[in-house]
Amino acid sequence: MSVSLEQTLGFRIKVTNVLDVVTEGRLYSFNSSNNTLTIQTTKKNQSPQNFKVIKCTFIKHLEVIGDKPSFNSFKKQQIKPSYVNVERVEKLLKESVIASKKKELLRGKGVSAEGQFIFDQIFKTIGDTKWVAKDIIILDDVKVQPPYKVEDIKVLHEGSNQSITLIQRIVERSWEQLEQDDGRKGG
């Protein structure tokens, strides 16, 4: 005997999907237009409510467990959605986009892994560090060109030698660290 899914609303069901994952709960809804089941997986009077939406094409086995509820108030039960602060969501989204753009600016395009590592090490110490093509520019005064060795550090403006010794030390230590890491990677 075949039973319409709409007639089983409110029943406890056990669904096994094609990956043999079993979900138990109350059948909350069946949508024939997009061929999905919504199963309420939380216990009665538990808040917040948890639901699983399962595409019927992924169902391997569906079993109604338990007897027919004597009083099926489930069809009339309405779960009120939680309040969502839209302004807060928009603010978090904007902050996330800004952080993502900032992170993207810190990634060199077409540079070697060593070059990116050197950039990251300099940026940790000196925040005013940026990529210009494949060159690392620090404080708009110092440039480090590929292959990003100490001898590739150039002063852009005469008289701005104050920060060059610090940058040379950072680059030197970074290369030492890279060489140590390469030694550990050996197979």
UniProtKB/Swiss-Prot annotation:
Top-level lineage group: Eukaryota
Residues in AD domain copies: 82-179
Start and end residues of each Sm domain: 1-68
Keywords: Acetylation, Cytoplasm, Nucleus
Classification via PROSITE patterns: AD, SM
MF (Gene Ontology): RNA binding
InterPro entries given in the database record: AD, Lsm12-like, LSM12_ABD, LSM12_LSM, RNA-processing_Lsm12, Sm
Subunit and partners: Interacts with IGO1, PBP1 and PBP4.
Further remark: Present with 8320 molecules/cell in log phase SD medium.
The protein's name in its UniProt record: Protein LSM12
